[in-house]
Structures are given as C-alpha cells and as structure tokens.
Amino acid sequence: KLAAKAKGLGIPVFYYISPKIWAWKEWRVKKIKKLVTAMYAIFPFEPDIYARHGMQVEYVGNPSVEELETRLEAAPSREDFLKANRLRDRKIIAMLPGSRRSEIRNNLQVMCRAVDMMPQYRGVIAGAPGIEDEFYRRLTNLPVLHGQTYSLLRHSHAALVTSGTATLEAALARVPQVVTYRANGSKLSYNIMKRLLKVNYVSLPNLIAGREIIPEQLLHMCTPDAVGEKLAAILPEREPRRLQLEGYDDMRARLGQNHAADRTAELIIKALTNK
C-alpha cells in the first residue's frame, strides 16, 4: 500500500529485501514491477526469479553474514558457556524447533526422540523469544537456553533445525544440521506443498547452493527414526559430515563479501543522483 501511494505521488520506490516470492505467489512480481523503481535482494538466487518476469534485480549481499560473524566472535569460551549453563562437557546437539508455539509443538518432540537415540550427545534447546520455559517443560526436560542461540551454535557439534532463517545461521556457523518441518505430518499436505512451492528446497542453504547440501525431513518424512538416521550420519568425522561442510563453503562463497545495507545505500544514492 505504501509503495502504491508513493508511486502515485511520483516518489521513487526502492525496495530493500525482497518478499519471498520464490517460495510461492510468484505472480506478485507483476505488481511489484509496476510499483517499484528498484529491488535489492539479499539472496543470490532471487535476481534470476525476477528476470523470468523481465525485472532486473540486484543482489547486494546478505546482512546475516556479518551479523552472525560478529556474534560468534563475541560468544564466550566453551568452558565459560558450559559453566554458565551448568552443562556437562559432552558434545552438544543444538535444537532449534522454531519461534512459534505451533512450530515448537510440532517439531520439538520429534527432535527430542531423535536425540534420545544418540546417548553420548547432549541435546540443548534454543529458546524462542517470548516463549516461556513452562511451555518447553510441558514437552521435554532438556535444557532450554534463552538469548544464547549464537553461543549455542558456536559450541555445538551438530544441529536439528526447523526450516527458516535459523538454517542459514547454522550453516554460517558451520554446524552440520538436519532440517525438520513437521506441521501436521500428513503425506497429503506434503503433496500439496510440493505443488505450491516454486522451488526445489525449503532450507536457505540448499536454495543458495542450488543443490541439496543438508537433508530436509518434511511433514510425513519428519519422523524420529528418519531424523535420527540423518543425524547419525553427520555426527562422525566421515564423508557425510565432510560433504556438508564443503557445501557450506560453496554456499558462503555464493553469498559474497558485500555489506548489504551499505551496498544498497550506495545504489540508491547513485540512482537518485544519476551518477
């Protein structure tokens, strides 16, 4: 609505961070093309999607890269992290079950049962903002850490991650992972989703790399046994783990070195001054 209003007043519209038209509703590009002077994307695969509709979009870099690198550098040492959270010195499997109650409810119990199959590892949950401990306690007795997601990733051996931005964060932190998305767990929902989605993957690392570098266990395939099998494969220092880490390197290279906000500002100034 704001873009349409500005366009009607003759004000140039610069759009930083594209809506996720690549997931579904790609038809929105037609409306965006009419209203937006320039679009700046934060994922390297987005310009090609817009190009199919005759719209030129510039990839400016991804802000998560520098933010995560800064946060990881600020993370406490492993010794201090374990001591502060009263955790024993065992290899950690980070569990990021989502930020909404429905997501957490659908995914966490699958994650917990998968981690139970790895008794030599310790599952630790990244608590979502605004979700109280009591909610998690009704689902599991595993430790829940609030406001420490980046420290948790920094000191984890592997991760179970519900699809979303957290998959990119785990990849940038170089934590081998399995992606889970349970929802209602039905095969019918899976078939509907596959028809609606305009992309081959749901996780950002796979979308950015343009190939599967991390396993995605979705809906009816998101069972404790299936997730546990994929998790067990990436725990030892063997080929599945090595290949995933190499995939992360490829993904990171595709993201580039640009400071996204600075690059966007430069392009907007250039467009406004016609330089």
Regions found by a protein language model. Name each.
Residues 1-275:
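Nucleotide-activated sugar donor-binding and catalytic core shared by glycosyltransferases
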